């Protein structure tokens, strides 16, 4: 310290001036510490409903969280609320990295993943959280995805070969170019954000397969290793499974992975036109 003071004095600074600088620096640090310690209270309004409670009706319940003591994502706030404020709050979550799709929900009016959606730091705004829309609710933020998964199963989302004699004995290879055709399709995590944002799916969810399932159907239709493309197309010929899509494009807008289900559906429609022409000429 003496050496520093000596250098400072040689440059024209007095010991008194140096002392003032030190005091100002200390005051600045104390002010920063005080500012950081000031609570930043954020209000969350969360949909609650417990079917096991007699007479319980859906309602919005508010919780207050100090953002200084919480992670940056909405899922961090939900976990903090469950762990420290209300253990009865129920929601799905797993990977916390936008990979599994478990924590899909409606946050401030848009379907997204709670683990990748940052908390709105405007303390004057209430963050509203609902389960995925137009789905039966099991409890709180947990939607019933039974119909969604049944529809996914119906498209047989796996590689199908007409000659299965070599199954398990050799690899089914494909070119780099054919593999690249699957980009933007295989990344789907089946979170159902797109399907539950689609008005056509709201109206005809029992018959219309929805954007998530149709995009996966297209993924297998264009896989060069699959040999059941025509059979897959034949399953979609009825008026509802495919053709309830009216290109509203909510699906593409809301996809948390940045995929384009609307485009995939349009490609299936083009394939269907060719398929029907081929059948008419047969």
UniProtKB/Swiss-Prot annotation:
Amino acids binding a ubiquinone: 203
For this entry, the transit peptide stretch runs 1-30
Chief location: mitochondrion
Q: In which pathway does it act?
A: Carbohydrate metabolism; tricarboxylic acid cycle; fumarate from succinate (eukaryal route): step 1/1
Membrane topology per the entry is: Peripheral membrane protein
Q: Read off the InterPro entries from this record.
A: 2Fe-2S_ferredoxin-like_sf, 2Fe-2S_ferredoxin-type, 2Fe2S_fd_BS, 4Fe4S_Fe-S-bd, 4Fe4S_Fe_S_CS, Beta-grasp_dom_sf, Helical_ferredxn, SDH/FRD_Iron-Sulfur
Provide the alphabetized UniProt keywords: 2Fe-2S, 3Fe-4S, 4Fe-4S, Acetylation, Electron transport, Iron, Iron-sulfur, Membrane, Metal-binding, Mitochondrion, Mitochondrion inner membrane, Oxidoreductase, Transit peptide, Transport, Tricarboxylic acid cycle
One Pfam family, please name it: Fer2_3
Gene Ontology biological process terms, A to Z:
aerobic respiration; mitochondrial electron transport, succinate to ubiquinone; proton motive force-driven mitochondrial ATP synthesis; respiratory electron transport chain; succinate metabolic process; tricarboxylic acid cycle
| SS bond partners | none
Catalysed reactions listed for this entry: a quinone + succinate = fumarate + a quinol; (R)-malate + a quinone = enol-oxaloacetate + a quinol; (S)-malate + a quinone = enol-oxaloacetate + a quinol
Segments of this protein annotated with the region Interaction with SDHAF1 = 148-220
Q: Which residues form the 2Fe-2S ferredoxin-type domain?
A: 56-135
Give the residues the record marks as binding [4Fe-4S] cluster: 188, 191, 194, 255
Tell me a Gene Ontology molecular-function term this record carries: ubiquinone binding
Q: What class of enzyme is it?
A: oxidoreductase
Needed cofactors: [2Fe-2S] cluster; [3Fe-4S] cluster; [4Fe-4S] cluster
Which SUPFAM superfamilies does the UniProt entry name for this protein?
A: 2Fe-2S ferredoxin-like, alpha-helical ferredoxin
Activity regulation field:
Enol-oxaloacetate inhibits the succinate dehydrogenase activity.
Q: Name one GO cellular component term.
A: mitochondrion
- Residues modified as N6-acetyllysine: 53, 57
Subunit record text: Component of complex II composed of four subunits: the flavoprotein (FP) SDHA, iron-sulfur protein (IP) SDHB, and a cytochrome b560 composed of SDHC and SDHD. Interacts with SDHAF1; the interaction is required for iron-sulfur cluster incorporation into SDHB.
- Explain the purpose of this protein: Iron-sulfur protein (IP) subunit of the succinate dehydrogenase complex (mitochondrial respiratory chain complex II), responsible for transferring electrons from succinate to ubiquinone (coenzyme Q). SDH also oxidizes malate to the non-canonical enol form of oxaloacetate, enol-oxaloacetate. Enol-oxaloacetate, which is a potent inhibitor of the succinate dehydrogenase activity, is further isomerized into keto-oxaloacetate.
Question: Which family does this protein fall into?
Answer: Belongs to the succinate dehydrogenase/fumarate reductase iron-sulfur protein family.
The molecule here is called: Succinate dehydrogenase [ubiquinone] iron-sulfur subunit, mitochondrial
Source species of the chain? Rattus norvegicus
Instruction: Recite the lineage of the species.
Output: Eukaryota, Metazoa, Chordata, Craniata, Vertebrata
């Amino acid at each position: 310290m003496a050496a520093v003071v000596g250098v400072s004095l040689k440059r024209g600074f007095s010991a008194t001036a140096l002392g003032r600088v030190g005091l100002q620096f200390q005051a600045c640090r104390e002010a920063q510490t005080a500012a950081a310690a000031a609570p930043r209270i954020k209000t969350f309004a969360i949909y609650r409903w417990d079917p096991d409670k007699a007479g319980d009706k859906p309602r919005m319940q508010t919780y207050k969280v100090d953002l200084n003591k919480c992670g940056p994502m909405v899922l961090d706030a939900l976990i903090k609320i469950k762990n420290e404020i209300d253990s009865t709050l129920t929601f799905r979550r797993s990977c916390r990295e936008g990979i599994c799709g478990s924590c899909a929900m409606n946050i401030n009016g848009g379907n997204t993943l709670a683990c990748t959606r940052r908390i709105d730091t405007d303390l004057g705004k209430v963050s509203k959280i609902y389960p995925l829309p137009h789905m039966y609710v099991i409890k709180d933020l947990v939607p019933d995805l039974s119909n969604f998964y049944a529809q996914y199963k119906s498209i047989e989302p796996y590689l199908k070969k007409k000659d299965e004699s070599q199954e398990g004995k050799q690899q089914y290879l494909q070119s780099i170019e054919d593999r690249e055709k699957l980009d933007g399709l295989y990344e789907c995590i089946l979170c159902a954000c797109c399907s539950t944002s689609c008005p056509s799916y709201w109206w005809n969810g029992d018959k219309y397969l929805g954007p998530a399932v149709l995009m996966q159907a297209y993924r297998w239709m264009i896989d060069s290793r699959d040999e059941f493309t025509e059979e897959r197309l034949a399953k979609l010929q009825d008026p509802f499974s495919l053709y309830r899509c009216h290109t509203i494009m909510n699906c593409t807008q809301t996809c948390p992975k940045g995929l384009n289900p609307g485009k995939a559906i349009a490609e299936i429609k083009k394939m269907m036109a060719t398929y029907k022409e081929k059948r008419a000429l047969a």
